[in-house]
Amino acid sequence: MYEVDARGLSCPQPLMLTNEALKTQKGAFKVLVSEPHQKTNVEKFAKDKGKKVTVKAVGSEFELIIE
């Protein structure tokens, strides 16, 4: 599965990387973020684009599967 590693990046970089993946990836992909507000922003952004989002906490970080 394609993976966007946005851990440690400042906003709006996680959203920009997610948007690029939405444009280029045909199937599901994973986004990794390190901050709760990044998780919230990426999740809302993907849902606003009509995507299904599954969120999982991995330690102090987050994994979002976007389909």
Name each model feature, range by range.
Residues 22-34:
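Short glycine-rich, basic-tinged beta-strand/loop micro-motifs
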Residues 1, 28, 59-63:
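A generic structural signal for beta-strand entry/edge sites
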Residues 1-25:
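An N-terminal amphipathic alpha-helical segment
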Residues 53-67:
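C-terminal edge-of-domain segments
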Residues 13-20, 36-49:
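Amphipathic alpha-helical interaction surfaces in cytosolic regulatory modules
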Residues 23, 49, 64-66:
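Iron-sulfur (Fe-S) cluster-binding modules
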